[in-house]
């Protein structure tokens, strides 16, 4: 059957949709992504949206225009199901589903049900969550499946000489990682800097600056705007420093890697804080909030962790307590049961 997946906004919404689409295609379904993302290697229909944080009038105009386009394309494709992944980019397609009386299933990646998913909550036949406890996701329609990621645990390797530190900035507030996190790494004690190798996701405009900074401190590094071999990077990491987006957390936790999470302070409903807290409460990560004390707190924490390999191993083992899981199979079972 034809299934439309409504997604967009950030990679945290898009990547799970792509993972699910690939799994559904294997089962013979025709999947099409309705999204605002233009560089994804899967069949998709692009909606001309812009981010709501910019020009408000432009956003509202493009949102209304996208609603008309989504309605037209949806009526033309006649899908049997529309799956929403949250974010403003999913709104036009989910609205079309409601108008055309097409069954809606929602997937929430974060520990707080997003605003668009809350808006369509009553219209949905099923709401699947990535965390065992999700704020605003209550009732018989809600089921914990897990997030959708292509990561498998490979065991935590003991660091004999070099400690590999993986830094994942994500798409929101990446300049903080380029500037503050890199500066903290360079201010570590000499005996720590001599042992570490940094693999870091940087914004394109800052790669040369950050590389020069590390070089001046004698720190071995690999920098890139995007890593297309994230599973391999995680497998080699002894510690990960990351934003607390749900998909990043799922990948890091399923890879059984200890982490330091720095939640993006402007995330809607402060969901990154609650994402990180869930993992911290399980002993698999430590959270550092982005505030005036962030540089000092992060520096002290990294000195402690990078000089205590046993603590890193304990955190890696605690990832098994988080209940984070790859939910593709469970989700497909749930929607099959719901639509049967």
UniProtKB/Swiss-Prot annotation:
GO cellular component, one term: plasma membrane
InterPro entries linked to this entry: GlcNAc_MurG, Glyco_trans_28_C, GlycoTrans_28_N
Molecular function GO terms recorded: UDP-N-acetyl-D-glucosamine:N-acetylmuramoyl-L-alanyl-D-glutamyl-meso-2,6-diaminopimelyl-D-alanyl-D-alanine-diphosphoundecaprenol 4-beta-N-acetylglucosaminlytransferase activity; undecaprenyldiphospho-muramoylpentapeptide beta-N-acetylglucosaminyltransferase activity
Keywords: Cell cycle, Cell division, Cell membrane, Cell shape, Cell wall biogenesis/degradation, Glycosyltransferase, Membrane, Peptidoglycan synthesis, Transferase
Domain of life: Bacteria
Subcellular location: Cell membrane
Reactions it catalyzes: di-trans,octa-cis-undecaprenyl diphospho-N-acetyl-alpha-D-muramoyl-L-alanyl-D-glutamyl-meso-2,6-diaminopimeloyl-D-alanyl-D-alanine + UDP-N-acetyl-alpha-D-glucosamine = di-trans,octa-cis-undecaprenyl diphospho-[N-acetyl-alpha-D-glucosaminyl-(1->4)]-N-acetyl-alpha-D-muramoyl-L-alanyl-D-glutamyl-meso-2,6-diaminopimeloyl-D-alanyl-D-alanine + UDP + H(+)
Chief place of localization: membrane
Pathway stated in the Swiss-Prot or TrEMBL entry: Cell wall biogenesis; peptidoglycan biosynthesis
Pfam family, one: Glyco_transf_28
SUPFAM superfamilies: UDP-Glycosyltransferase/glycogen phosphorylase
The enzyme's E.C. designation: 2.4.1.227
Cell membrane recorded as keyword: yes
Residues at which UDP-N-acetyl-alpha-D-glucosamine binds: 10-12, 110, 171, 272
Family recorded in the similarity comment: Belongs to the glycosyltransferase 28 family. MurG subfamily.
UniProt protein name: UDP-N-acetylglucosamine--N-acetylmuramyl-(pentapeptide) pyrophosphoryl-undecaprenol N-acetylglucosamine transferase
Species for this entry: Wolbachia pipientis subsp. Culex pipiens (strain wPip)
